[in-house]
């Protein structure tokens, strides 16, 4: 048994110790996380607690639609989504059950979870992804792309690659920029980025990284874990791409780099609530948090977790980076405004 799995089993035992064993040794999970590395996390939880995980996979939008359709008949106990705006939407639509958990509240920073109510907290971030700028080292100086505002600088006209503006990763970034800049300046920024596009938005984040390396564009935007995945790849073609690009964690001298989250919630009509809370608490444990980092190259959401991931360490020069501290709920609150701005700008 690996050292990391032993640590995970120990974490599960600690989570289980303070709670009586549920009548039903099962937890039903609806998950938008499609990462094979998560299987060891799930298996570790079951081995340590005896609680079996029944999992249904889908994307964020599909899971929310399914919960609405199932209503009170839904078997779901835990919901895991990979975007803050969708978590916010699920809360607003009454699909989650607020909970009180000292373990979760102590572990997860207040800006990475739902706003508290008298009934508890509806959802918690469990891992984070930094939205970073990549640049072609032969064509761009890092000093010229130190903040998100530079993406709209006219000197980069025809040089920016980014996936669809309406993709959740970008909607999340744009939603927090509205919070930082205000609506008028944020809309001007979106229009400036549209003017700087090297091509119509297409592909995923890995495609933007490759396009920057090839010279099709000189700057791009990606989630950090896509770059870390390529950095850890043994494929020569991936290493060739990595060798041509640099990475910037934007806005270190101002509001900090934007983080989106993958997070979890207890379903509104959970039949196995105690098991659901145990599972979320397990995922917030230091061992599980480090496993998120090693398995899918994500940053831990919990406080004070030491990383083992060499790519994440290399990406930041082995130093912590400044991330924004505004409540991640701002992403959801600003979504309608952002989509209207994108429509006015003709940003696909």
Model-identified regions with their sequence ranges:
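A structural signal for short loop-to-beta-strand junctions that line the ligand-binding cleft
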Residues: 74-79, 97-133, 149, 160-161
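Periplasmic solute-binding protein
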Residues: 87-95, 118-146, 174-175, 259-265
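Mature extracytoplasmic/periplasmic domains
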Residues: 262-325
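Ligand-binding pocket segment of bilobal, Venus flytrap-like solute-binding proteins
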Residues: 165, 169-172, 176-250
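N-terminal signal peptide c-region/cleavage motif recognized by signal peptidases
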Residues: 17-19
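Short beta-strand->loop
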Residues: 30-33, 119-123, 135-137, 143, ...
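Extracellular/periplasmic bilobal clamshell ligand-binding domains
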Residues: 308-348
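Early extracytoplasmic/lumenal segment of secretory-pathway proteins
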Residues: 23-89, 348
């Amino acid at each position: 048994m690996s050292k990391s799995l032993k640590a995970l089993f120990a974490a599960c035992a600690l989570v289980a110790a303070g709670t009586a064993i549920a009548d039903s040794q099962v937890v039903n999970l609806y998950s938008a996380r499609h990462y094979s590395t998560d299987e060891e996390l799930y298996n570790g939880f079951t081995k340590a607690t005896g609680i079996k995980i029944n999992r249904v996979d889908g994307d964020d939008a599909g899971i929310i639609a399914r919960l609405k359709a199932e209503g009170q008949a839904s078997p779901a106990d835990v919901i895991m989504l990979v975007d803050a705006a969708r978590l916010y939407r699920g809360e607003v639509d009454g699909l989650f059950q607020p909970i009180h958990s000292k373990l979760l509240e102590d572990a997860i920073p207040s800006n990475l979870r739902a706003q508290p109510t008298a009934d508890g907290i509806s959802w918690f971030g469990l891992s984070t992804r930094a939205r970073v700028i990549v640049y072609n080292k032969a064509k761009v100086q890092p000093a010229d792309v130190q903040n998100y505002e530079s993406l709209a600088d006219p000197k980069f006209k025809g040089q920016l690659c980014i996936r669809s503006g309406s993709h959740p990763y970008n909607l999340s970034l744009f939603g927090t920029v509205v919070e930082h800049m205000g609506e008028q300046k944020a809309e001007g920024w979106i229009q400036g980025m549209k003017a700087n596009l090297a091509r119509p938005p297409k592909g995923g984040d890995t495609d933007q990284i490759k396009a920057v390396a090839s010279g099709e564009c000189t700057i791009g935007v990606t989630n950090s874990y896509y770059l870390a995945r390529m950095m850890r790849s043994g494929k020569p073609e991936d290493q060739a791409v990595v060798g041509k690009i640099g990475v910037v964690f934007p806005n270190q001298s101002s509001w900090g780099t934007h983080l989106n989250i993958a997070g979890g919630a207890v379903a509104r009509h959970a039949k196995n609530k105690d098991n659901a809370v145990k599972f979320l608490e397990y995922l917030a444990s230091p061992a599980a948090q480090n496993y998120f980092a090693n398995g899918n190259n994500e940053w831990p959401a919990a406080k004070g977790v030491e990383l083992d991931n060499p790519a994440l360490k290399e990406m930041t020069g082995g130093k912590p980076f400044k991330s924004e501290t505004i409540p991640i709920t701002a992403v959801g609150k600003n979504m309608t405004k952002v989509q209207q701005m994108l429509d006015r700008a003709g940003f696909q």
